[in-house]
């Protein structure tokens, strides 16, 4: 039996990059997957690809910077399309600004990063938890970053948002475990995706400092998410799982 057979998963920011890889991997493991992001055409292509491989997937277009009503609509439509309460939520979507000195961050950038990276996961999780509780439990996986653990110059805004998400993981894990809901974080290091292939030489150079000297791939992160979403991780709550080639270990 596939590890996520019969379960419903919502993966935010899944029209590209790590989110797309996670959504596709979950479908291969038997989950009913709801893909969401900006761009209906791209979303439809991903759904078509999953279905062509024998999986089940749906798409909901949603703007996570648009506030609570939009996020609650996403939760409702995802649940309706899945035909059951969402069992697995992957809070993957994030807004990333280019590295810059902290003195040059604008209020607009600060608001947008915190809106998408912290507020949206908070509201979406709150909207889906009641259904998980009613259905006997679930799994929430927050996509963190090693940038939310280590201090990295010129990325303080993004790092602060991810550190906030890491904190939510621990608090929610303590609060929701009694309801059968597990909350954990996956924290990728630099990862090559289809959208940053042009940065491969830089990412490979960074990987030379890792103990395993391996550049992260989407598949590396997706494997960690699948594990935490599965029953194999049934006794794991509130952890931060780095997928970074050992970078945080040194």
Model-found features: residue ranges?
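A glycine/serine/threonine-rich, flexible loop-to-helix segment
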Residues: 48, 178, 185-210
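Substrate-binding pocket helix/loop in short-chain dehydrogenase/reductase
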Residues: 100-102, 106-114, 196, 206
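Alpha-helical segment proximal to the catalytic Tyr-Lys
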Residues: 130, 174-178, 234
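Residue(s) in the substrate-gating loop at a strand-loop-helix junction
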Residues: 145
């Amino acid at each position: 039996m596939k590890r996520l057979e019969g379960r419903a998963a919502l993966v935010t920011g899944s029209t590209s990059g790590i989110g797309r890889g996670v959504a596709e991997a979950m479908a291969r493991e038997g989950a009913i997957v709801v893909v969401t992001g900006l761009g209906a055409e791209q979303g439809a292509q991903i759904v078509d690809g999953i279905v062509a491989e024998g999986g089940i997937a749906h798409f909901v277009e949603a703007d996570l910077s648009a506030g609570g009503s939009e996020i609650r609509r996403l939760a409702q439509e995802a649940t309706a399309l899945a035909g059951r309460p969402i069992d697995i939520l992957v809070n993957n979507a994030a807004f990333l600004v280019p590295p810059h000195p902290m003195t040059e961050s604008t209020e607009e950038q600060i608001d947008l990063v915190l809106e998408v990276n912290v507020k949206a996961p908070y509201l979406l999780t709150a909207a889906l938890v009641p259904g998980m509780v009613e259905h006997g439990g679930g799994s929430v996986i927050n996509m963190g970053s090693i940038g939310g653990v280590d201090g990295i110059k010129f990325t303080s805004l993004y790092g602060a948002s991810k550190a906030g998400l890491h904190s939510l993981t621990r608090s929610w894990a303590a609060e929701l475990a009694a309801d059968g809901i597990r909350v954990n974080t996956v924290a990728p290091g630099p990862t090559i995706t289809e959208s940053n292939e042009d940065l491969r030489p830089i990412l490979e150079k960074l990987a030379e400092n890792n103990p395993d000297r391996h550049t992260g791939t989407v598949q590396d992160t997706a494997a960690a998410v699948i594990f935490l979403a599965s029953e194999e991780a049934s006794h794991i709550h509130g952890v931060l799982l780095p997928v970074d080639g050992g970078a945080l270990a040194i």
